[in-house]
Amino acid sequence: GYYQKEALPTLDGTLSKADVAALLKDCIDHSGHKLMPDFRNLWPYSNPYTAPDYPYVASNHLSWYGEDGANLETIFMIKYSSKAVWDNSNAHRNNQVDLYFSPRETDSSTENNFPLGIGWGFGPVSPAMINDWQTAEPTDLRRKASVFDVADEAPNYVWGADKQYNETGLWQKKYCAINVKVTDASGNVSYENYSRKLYPGIDPDYQLNNIQDIVVLRFSDILLMYSELTHTVDGINAVRTRAGLTPITAYSDNALRNERRWELAFEGLRWYDLLRWHMAGDALARENGVPMQDNLEQKTMDMSDIRQRVTDTGGFLQIPQTQIDLSNGVLKQNPGWTGDNLLY
């Protein structure tokens, strides 16, 4: 882990690497969870309402496992409500990750990004990541299952819509708004979130009607964690086999790290993996110079001195001085956040 120790203290003793490996093995053998057969059916874009009009899903005969207990790969998830409304206590009941990470667009009812819906345009996928993936695993089915390439899937995509920044033409499609095509009695076509089919009374506001579960832990992560701790290949190979890839014959840290990168892409784990491997600064620095557009202006990504920033701070945020004061000095400021000339 981050602290490079074989054991860490707990309230009633210590927790060792061997203890964690044993817990993971128990989960693998006795939990009832398992890898589901098709990686692509884990994600809502394969839902039955979107499927007929989304060629990628229809041509591959995909069928969503859903979120009602049939998906035995999901171990722990965060559920969301169909009752979100605009007030301080209820707006958060919808999945705002989907909202943040869907493309910007001026009209939520258009076909431009289908099946992707409209959102706030955060987190376009880096071409550098796709190049790495293509080079490492050219036949990996998870790449197209995870990334929406507008050049391939959206001929009517509008670049620079609603002043989109950091635009690469690549969007992740694991956690984003997913639309369905709706044709009324007069033959008029519109598009709306698939949640409107599951819960017809849900608010039509695209900022309130994303209800996809956030999966915090799934079984493939358990398998990969066990392989990492035990330096064995069985977990890695189970994940690779499902993705249509050749099994590896010997464990290596590089193979494990790549497998986590591809299998768990866009699921909120990569940053913490990079931190605990002490690779975050180098990985972020590689994004310098990556091509993208800001509101139709061609630019390149500028991460500046991000490697030094991560080195100085260890990747940790600044502890608010008010909290340090309240602790009467028990809390100490994180490294890299002291002095009169803070860079960050």
Q: Which positions does each model-derived feature cover?
A:
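Acidic surface patches and DE-rich sequence motifs
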Residues: 29, 184, 241, 311
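Long, intrinsically disordered, low-complexity segments
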Residues: 45-105, 206-216, 237-240, 248-344
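Extracellular/surface-associated beta-sandwich interaction domains
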Residues: 12-17, 24-28, 34, 187-196, ...
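Coil residues (strongly favoring Ser/Thr
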Residues: 108, 185-186, 313
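Flexible, polar/acidic helix-loop-strand segments at domain edges
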Residues: 124-217
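Extended, hydrophobic/aromatic-rich amphipathic alpha-helical segments that build helical scaffolds
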Residues: 1-29, 76, 140-148, 213-239, ...
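An aromatic- and glycine-enriched ligand-binding surface/loop that stacks and positions planar moieties
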Residues: 1-167
